[in-house]
From Swiss-Prot:
Taxonomy of the source species: Bacteria, Pseudomonadati, Pseudomonadota, Gammaproteobacteria, Enterobacterales
Protein's UniProt name: L-rhamnonate dehydratase
CC cofactor note: Binds 1 Mg(2+) ion per subunit.
Organism this protein belongs to: Escherichia coli O1:K1 / APEC
Cofactor(s) listed in the protein's UniProt record: Mg(2+)
Coiled-coil features, chain-numbered ranges: none
PROSITE patterns: MR_MLE_1 (PS00908)
EC assignment: 4.2.1.90
Gene behind this protein: rhmD
Active-site annotation: 329
């Protein structure tokens, strides 16, 4: 009889944070909205707060960067460690060290689904439909997958069953699709800058932006719009039709997460051939099931916010059963290892974090070391052939551990 590998138990879980409200602006890391001055990601992007003039110009003005980066590290009895990052900051540290630790420590490193289910059910009374608590659970889940991969000496994508393609092709999210085309990406997704409070003038301005980029990028390059929950059905419908002459591939997250009937109506109203997408700010498996039922074309969970890799795999199955694509909101290596195993993810997102979108910069810079970036718009599966998620924690990032147990 062949010997079966004996897996260690988890000795300890630890949580740090960096950045956030008490830090100097521009920490980056897991909270990639926390960028310095003159960055495209904070330049008059339409949001649900844009109707208030005091908060129209900058997303940081209403506090999009107050949470900061959460780092969760799990250590096995044999001394090996796994870690992950997300957006939950000091409050996430409290949840990990004072609540979730009891479900993690003492478990086998392979007990990921058991730990995941216990974390979800134990936080139901204060987690609601996602948000901070789900970000924290996601971070723990990703750290567990990282540890498991390192213990058995395999990349996470092989733990999920292996790659279904040799490489991942990417579109770029940022203010300059024309530069993204030069870098080899298959498409460019731009943020909208105007919303319902701006009336038809706002529609004309954003449509003119799309028209300008279509002229610069040519007919075959994908162009998309990211509306970041800032619209209503009527405005989104008018914007979609205004952009139809410029072959807009999809219009994304026009409505707040729970407006399921609105998404159903928008899909019905959208021009023929234009896709409707959403999911970035949905935080539970149940919400993705309901979102799928609206008939949208692509679901876009963030693996660091939706419940982690364990939930992302389940979301992909829901989408596949309905003939929908799942294209995760850009989350770097944590998405790469998943999407290369999904048959219904033919491409993925890369978020441009350089200030003017002119250079390639790792999304979670500087918190991750050895974080890969696309080359000519692609990442080959061989780049992912390292144990776990294949990245290391940069411990020079002023990490703080405010709680212990």
């Amino acid at each position: 009889m062949e010997n079966i590998m004996t897996l260690p138990k988890i000795k300890q879980v630890r949580a740090w944070f960096t950045g956030g409200a008490i830090a100097e602006k521009g920490a980056g890391g897991g909270d990639y909205h926390d960028q310095g001055a003159n960055h495209w990601i904070d330049d008059h992007i339409a949001t649900p707060m844009s109707k208030y003039r005091d908060y129209e110009q900058s997303r940081q003005s209403f506090g999009i960067n107050v949470l900061g980066t959460l780092v969760v590290e799990v250590e096995a009895e044999n001394g090996q460690t796994g870690f992950a990052v997300s957006t939950a900051g000091e409050m996430g540290c409290f949840i990990v060290e004072k609540h979730l630790n009891r479900f993690i420590e003492g478990k086998c490193v392979s007990d990921i689904k058991l730990i995941h289910d216990q974390m979800l059910n134990a936080t139901l009374y204060y987690s609601g439909s996602g948000g901070l608590v789900m970000n924290t659970i996601s971070c723990v889940d990703l750290a567990l997958w990282d540890l498991f991969g390192k213990v058995v000496g395999l990349p996470v994508y092989k733990l999920l069953g292996g790659a279904v393609r040799d490489e991942i092709q990417f579109y770029a999210t940022g203010a300059r699709p024309d530069l993204a085309k030069e870098m080899g990406f298959i498409g460019g997704k731009m943020p909208t800058h105007w919303g319902p409070h701006d009336g038809d003038a706002g529609i004309r301005k954003d449509a003119a932006m799309v028209a300008d980029m279509r002229e610069k990028c040519g007919e075959d390059f994908w162009l998309m719009l990211d509306c970041w929950m800032s619209q209503d059905v009527n405005y989104a419908t008018k914007l979609a039709h205004a952009c139809a002459p410029y072959n807009l591939k999809w219009i994304e997250e026009c409505l707040p997460p729970q407006q399921y009937e609105g998404y159903r109506e928008l899909k019905h109203n959208a021009p023929a051939g234009m896709m409707v997408t959403s999911g970035e700010h949905h935080g539970t498996l149940q919400s993705f099931r309901t979102l799928s039922e609206t008939g949208i074309d692509i679901m876009q969970p963030d693996v660091g916010w939706c419940g982690g890799l364990t939930t992302l795999v389940e979301i992909a199955a829901i989408a596949k059963s309905r003939g929908q694509l799942v294209v995760p909101h850009g989350s770097s290596v944590y998405s790469h290892h998943a999407v290369i195993t999904f048959t219904n993810t033919p491409f993925s997102e890369f978020l441009m974090t350089s200030p003017d979108c002119s250079t390639m910069r790792p999304q979670f810079d500087p918190i991750l070391l050895n974080e890969p970036v696309p080359v000519n718009g692609r990442i080959h599966k061989s780049v992912l052939d390292k144990p776990g998620f294949g990245v290391e924690l940069n411990r020079d990032c002023n990490l703080k551990r405010p709680y212990s147990h």
